[in-house]
Amino acid sequence: MNAHNYNYVESVGILEDSKKYTEKEHLVSKKILCKDYNDAVILPPKADYAGKRNGNWGKGGVVDSEGNFIVASTYVGDWATQGGFYEYNHVDKIIDDDVVYIGFISGHYGHFLVDCTTKLWPLVNMKKLGKNVKVAYTGDNELNGNAKMIINLLGINDEDLLYIDEVTKFRKVYVPEQSAKPGEWYTREYLKVFETIQENIKQRAEVHSEIKRKVYFTRTGYLDAKKKEVGEKTLEKVFAYNNFEIYNPERLSIVDMMEIINESTEVACINGTIPLNMIFSYNKNVKLIVLNKTGVYHRNLEYFAEICNFRIIYVDVYDKKFKAKDLGVGPFIVTVTDNLRNYFLDNGMKIPNETKTFKYKDYCTFLILLANRSVRDKLRPVKNKLKEILHK
């Protein structure tokens, strides 16, 4: 039975999709392997313009000493895919080290959490691989920020992280299989990754048991949000009026963010990447209020909620006249809806009398963003075709 609260949600699609998801078993007893290959080569990512457009992160991966591509070095998710052999003239670099290859690391933090954590499971117990084994990865850029800190929280030091941006041969390469496929299945090895991170955060974070906080994590500080989201400042104000502390998560380390969450009774945020961070919290009693910016089901959030056992209260805050058809691209407009008013009323919270549901400036901004997206959508096939021609 679904433990999440949908009393403040109107989308029939969300309700039906959630029901379908909870009817399936996602924890599997699948045996996953981490095989090693002597004198193996790591190929950095190379754009694959012949492949599908969305979610294709290019070719690349691991090739054994005989030139055979190692299929386990690819990634197949529910949306994103990465990996595949391509011809190369020579090896650019030879490093006399043993490494474990954790795959392609996306520069998008949400995709890092969902897609790029599936091959981290050998890092939980590196001793099994042997002494002085380092961690190799490819990706958009070198690891930084909270993505790197999450790897550090598995016991990996910065000096043992090797970013591969050219064809590189190693003494030995360990290649782990995926421990999960987002939204579809996961193994106990995958679960252990997050349990380990939770425990290490618990050891680092300062927790003041006497503090009982209510917090709202806002997206208004994200540059990307400013390009596609309108109206959240109004939501900030109504939550602040009810004694919620307002935080910008992009200014917090993952340890600091969990320190805040772990001593909170209530956490509120817009649906998207922010609530995915709850997978690192050991506070299972927190009331998580997720504000829907559209009527599209976020399967990966419920997938993470299942893995680490947290419950969600969903509240619609989008204008039904302008609801987006996706979770990421938008544009989105959020406001004080009847569903939010009902949630506040049912929970002894108040909305300031002067709060305006309709703001002319917000709607004008939204319509401009909507027009911009329409133009981009029309130009995208031309842009992709041009890229394909230039890279032939």
For the regions a language model picked out, list residue spans one by one.
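The feature primarily captures lumenal catalytic ectodomains
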Residues: 1-390
